[in-house]
Amino acid sequence: MLQWVRSVIYTVLLFLVTGFFGVVVLLSALLPLSIEQRYVIPRSWGLFLTWLARVVCGLGYTIEGQENLPSRPFISLWKHSSVWETLAQMFVVPPASWSLKREVIWIPIVGWAVRTFNPIAINRSAGHSAVNQMVQQGRERLASGMGVIVYPEGTRMAPGQTRKYGISGALLACETGAPVVPIAHNSGYFWRRRSLLKKAGTIRVVIGPPIDPTGLTPREVNERAQQWIEAKVAEIVAQPGGQPR
């Protein structure tokens, strides 16, 4: 029962803090600052809320494999199973353009704030043209010096589940030569999708070796990324502390 109370308190604080940071972002957009300079705001948002999750809910984290992050712009493919990685993406990798469904940028205050960072907002109902949108906009972001964050499963998956990875991130890599960095974690076991409860424990984030798309097809890049991510998640979960007791 106590963990439920803590989870409710954290959720209320999450909404309040997110609204506050949304206003700060909108005000910062009025200043002559680049996206990279303003990125300190969402980074601070992610760091603060993950710290708050540790304090209020007892949900901490570790990050492994940071030496695998390339020095040039890259595409990170993330396992998607929780809200938590939406916070963590802000500080685990360098400033990057977020790939998301366009409905997000319509949300008052928060969505408007997201829009000021020029995300890759995709109309998912557009089918194949949505992939083209992603590749075209992703190419522009990479050329500007920013990385690209992609959740190839397209939606949050329940613990232990996955689906065929979407091709857009891998296609972007093959067309631009940008390396793909797979990122695995077990956040969904502690902070499940569609659940208010945040369980105490430690989330492990593991950054995998970059995948060089040279000479590979988008399907091959995708397969390598998915195999590594899903195998690493299974490995994390199988170890002591990998999931709640």
Summary of predicted features, one role per range:
Residues 63, 120-123, 213:
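Short acidic-hydrophobic, aromatic-tinged amphipathic segments that line or gate anion-handling sites
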Residues 4, 131-245:
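Non-catalytic C-terminal accessory region of glycerolipid acyltransferases
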Residues 63, 76, 98-99, 205-207:
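Generic preference for hydrophobic
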Residues 25-47, 55-56, 70-127:
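Catalytic core of membrane glycerolipid acyltransferases/transacylases, capturing the structured
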